[in-house]
């Protein structure tokens, strides 16, 4: 079956990018890219390893083939070195030197301003670092949502923009080394291939493959320009996303590197899930129609921004500086898209404190000890009051009923 699919996609992708921009073609392109990049052949796309290098080559060759007849398109790579410690959990300048590479596609429309579109293509390899998988066997972490989904969206968006909007130049960057610490985006911003002052704004796609039935979509960085909120809300009138907007320009993804260069930057995100950083983040769980919906939403944002002459930059409050420090956890996955009162739980890790005392997915934490929990920040404040071995009562809301759970932190 896989042979037939591969042959079909081979003939399909012989068409040039601009020949067919229909929704059908674009969604098929997205599916093809996600399926390829999240295949076992790439062994989890770890930075500096054979699978990661192979993934970068695939993206480069894909763009090269598609844009081979377009004189205003340039495809190139940006290599950089990084150090790997013998201990996989520690990055060290004294470790083994390895090569990584960003993959670039630049559409030159001879305009003064450039819009940067970014997505990291690296992932966790076999899970020797950064994995939340607790099994004993080493397994490939394919990272279909994180972040084959973002790469596919960005590449397909370049296809659409080539014909639909020539008001700007466009630079797509598939970043390497994000999982190890934003290596690729940081290197680009320190060694830019275009003048940073010419960048109008940056759009980052990281984990956009799990749009749920409520159409919940998080957009981080809306405070990085005074123009973002009105622009996004106006465009969303015709898109019906349930938006969760966050102002901070700092976050655990590549938009942060651009924000630190005084560039307005957004991060699009469909939410965390139980498969995050686990081998189970596979392509059969991706919402391909959802990625397409986000793509056209972003295309409309870019188009609507045409009427804004001065896209200003604003410094934002760094939410991470206000984050309380804590030494214990419940062993649960927060629902970062939840906009109600409390902290809703999106997943529970087996064997951890929450699981041991009967906390379930879907429960909403509303109080921890003496601390009322209204959001993620107050939840972390509650955790900061305790140490390992401390006993407390956690009040949750389950199916509309308040329940007190007495527990001891492990």
What positions do the PLM features span?
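A non-catalytic alpha/beta surface segment that caps or lines the substrate-entry region
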Residues: 45-107
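N-terminal capping segment at the start of a domain
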Residues: 24-54, 65-74, 201, 205-210, ...
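Conserved PDZ fold ligand-binding element
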Residues: 356-376
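Bacterial Sec-dependent N-terminal signal peptides
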Residues: 1-24
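PDZ/PDZ-like groove recognition
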Residues: 317-361
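PDZ-domain C-terminal substructure recognizer with occasional recognition of PDZ-binding tails
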Residues: 381-410
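Active-site-adjacent substrate-binding region
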Residues: 74-77, 208-316
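Acidic/histidine-rich catalytic neighborhood of metal-dependent amide-processing enzymes
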Residues: 88, 93, 97-99, 125, ...
């Amino acid at each position: 079956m896989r042979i037939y699919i591969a042959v079909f996609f081979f003939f399909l992708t012989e068409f040039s990018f601009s020949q067919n921009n229909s929704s059908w073609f674009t969604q098929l392109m997205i599916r093809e890219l996600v399926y390829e990049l999240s295949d076992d052949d790439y062994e989890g796309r770890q930075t500096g390893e054979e699978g990661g290098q192979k993934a970068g080559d695939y993206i480069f060759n894909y763009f090269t083939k598609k844009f081979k007849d377009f004189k205003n398109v340039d495809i190139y790579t940006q290599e950089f070195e990084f150090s790997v410690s013998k201990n996989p959990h520690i990055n060290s300048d004294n470790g083994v030197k390895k090569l990584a590479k960003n993959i670039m596609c630049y559409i030159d429309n001879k305009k003064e301003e450039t819009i940067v579109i970014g997505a990291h293509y690296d992932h966790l390899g076999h899970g020797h670092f950064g994995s939340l998988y607790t099994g004993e066997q080493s397994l490939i972490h394919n990272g279909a949502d994180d972040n084959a989904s973002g790469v596919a969206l960005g590449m397909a968006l370049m296809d659409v923009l080539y014909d639909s909007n020539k008001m700007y130049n466009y630079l797509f960057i598939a970043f390497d080394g994000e999982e190890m610490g934003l290596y690729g985006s940081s290197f680009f911003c320190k060694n830019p291939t275009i003048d940073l002052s010419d960048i109008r704004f940056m759009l980052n796609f990281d984990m956009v493959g799990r749009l749920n039935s409520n159409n919940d979509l998080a957009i981080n960085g809306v405070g990085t320009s005074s123009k973002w909120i009105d622009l996004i809300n106006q465009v969303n009138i015709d898109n019906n996303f349930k938006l969760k907007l966050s102002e901070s320009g700092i976050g655990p993804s590549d938009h942060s590197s651009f924000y630190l260069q005084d560039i307005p930057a957004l991060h699009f995100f469909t939410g965390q899930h139980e498969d995050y950083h686990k081998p189970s983040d596979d392509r059969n769980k991706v919402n391909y129609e959802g990625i397409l919906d986000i793509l056209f939403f972003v295309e409309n944002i870019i188009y609507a921004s045409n009427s804004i002459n001065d896209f200003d930059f604003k410094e934002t409050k760094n939410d991470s500086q206000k984050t309380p420090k804590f030494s214990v956890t419940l062993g649960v996955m927060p629902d970062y898209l939840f906009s109600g009162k409390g902290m809703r739980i999106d997943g529970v890790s087996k064997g951890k404190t929450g699981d041991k005392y009967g906390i379930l997915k879907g429960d909403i934490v509303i109080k921890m000890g003496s601390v009322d929990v209204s959001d993620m920040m107050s939840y972390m404040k509650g955790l900061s009051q305790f140490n390992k071995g401390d006993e407390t009562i956690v009040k949750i809301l389950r199916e509309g009923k308040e329940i007190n759970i007495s527990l001891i932190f492990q």
